[in-house]
A protein has these predicted regions:
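Secretory targeting signals
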Residues: 23, 27-58, 92-93, 101-106, ...
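Junction motif at the cytosolic side of a transmembrane helix
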Residues: 7-10, 272-279, 348-369
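Transmembrane helix segments
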Residues: 34, 280-315
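Loop-to-transmembrane-helix entry motif
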Residues: 11-15, 195, 199, 283
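Low-complexity, proline/glycine-enriched hydrophobic segments characteristic of transmembrane helices
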Residues: 42-85
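Hydrophobic alpha-helical transmembrane segments
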Residues: 4, 17-22, 255-260, 287-288, ...
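Short helix-to-coil transition segments within interhelical loops
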Residues: 177-184
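Aromatic- and glycine-rich beta-strand/loop motifs that create alpha-glucan
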Residues: 1-20, 24, 189-191
């Protein structure tokens, strides 16, 4: 425990990591200001918030505009057919799954149609919220900002781990560490300390991002609104239809689940970083290899074969969750439109990363001076 505290202290005292974290925070602040934070947008959001939550005190102009929008889009579930959504998506994307794989995707969309019928019966789609196609708050937070957050926190995690794991080589004491079994076991503490510090920096950046966003966008009395509500819906792939979530997910539940996925992704990144550094023993080379590795994995996600290998490839590719950010826990990607797909990706990718790290540790313990 004492060694762990000492290693964490090294990382938390390093000025470069704080500079990177603060720089990312400023970048998020500017992004939020651009999307929803300028004075005109904040004023409009406050006025619309009153129109959504308290019609009696709302401005007539905003109340009328909101009523017209609700009249236009408030009944989308009445005619929503998930089979037609599937057909349109296949046509637009050019993706045509065949055989048993194609039937499996069709069955997933049939289950989504049952979910649509459930939403109709329970009235889940009738809740009031900011007009989705006007403000695009869901895609702004969980798409644009969350994707930036994933990249930024990933960099912070990688830098934290590489700094501690390569500390001895940088300061010319690696020979002393590799000379004994006890010295080699120190690397496990360094890996854990690096992961904890990476989570600390990531937590600071995430909290800052959320505080700034929700300071700009009033959410009082809206946390209970389901993400599947018609008013939350936004245009996607030149189509306008609701976010059909696999379960009833209010705004606060969706935020918590998004945070869980973010932590899971950071855990995978930590394991992969440890594995690469254990193999290469050089933080500069490791950082370059990690960048190429994740970039390659991201591009691989766009390779389509039209069979079950597409699903297997996505299960073992954590960058898929980056690509689909904003569409988690709902109908989105054709291959992943089934409940729990996010956790399946985290489990499979995490298992592969841990196995790779175990191989790296085995190799590291065989190193000699």
């Amino acid at each position: 425990m004492r060694l762990l505290q000492k290693e964490c202290g090294k990382c938390l005292r390093h000025p470069f990591l704080w500079i990177v974290c603060i720089t990312f925070g400023l970048f998020q602040f500017l992004s939020i200001y651009t999307y929803v934070g300028n004075a005109g947008m904040r004023k409009e959001l406050r006025q619309m918030h009153v129109a959504v939550t308290d019609e009696e005190t709302a401005s007539p102009e905003y109340e009328s505009a909101y009523a017209d929008y609700k009249k236009t889009y408030g009944g989308m579930y009445d005619t929503l057919d998930m089979r037609k959504i599937l057909e349109q998506k296949e046509k637009k994307s050019g993706y045509e799954p065949q055989g048993a794989w194609g039937m499996w995707i069709v069955r997933n969309y049939d289950r989504l149609q049952k979910r649509v019928e459930q939403i109709r019966k329970t009235g889940e789609g009738t809740y009031a919220f900011y007009p989705g196609s006007w403000y695009k708050l869901h895609s702004t937070l969980y798409g644009k900002l969350w994707k930036k957050l994933i990249l930024q926190t990933a960099v912070l995690m990688i830098l934290s781990m590489l700094y501690l794991m390569d500390y001895e080589r940088i300061y010319k004491t690696q020979d002393l560490v590799l000379a004994t079994t006890t010295g080699k076991k120190m690397m496990e503490k360094k890996m854990l300390a690096g992961a904890l510090c990476g989570l600390f920096y990531a937590g600071l950046l995430t909290v800052f991002t959320l505080l700034v966003f929700f300071a700009a966008v009033p959410f009082q009395n809206l946390w209970h609104v389901p993400v599947a509500a018609c008013m939350v819906a936004e245009p996607r792939l030149q189509m306008m239809y609701p976010f059909v979530t696999f379960w009833r997910l209010e705004q606060w539940r969706y935020l918590l689940l998004a945070l869980v996925v973010l932590v899971g992704l950071l855990g995978i990144i930590a394991a992969v970083t440890a594995a690469v550094q254990l193999f290469l023993q050089n933080s500069y080379f490791s950082f370059a290899v990690l960048g190429l590795l994740f970039m390659g994995a991201y591009l691989l996600g766009y390779v389509q074969m039209g069979n079950v290998w597409d699903l297997i490839r996505e299960f073992f590719n954590p960058t898929v969750l980056y690509a689909t950010s904003g569409g988690w826990f709902m109908e989105n990607d054709l291959c992943l439109s089934f409940a729990g797909n996010e956790f399946a990706v985290l489990f499979c990718s995490g298992t592969a990363a841990v196995c790779l790290m175990a191989v790296g540790k085995r190799r590291y313990h065989r190193l000699e001076v």
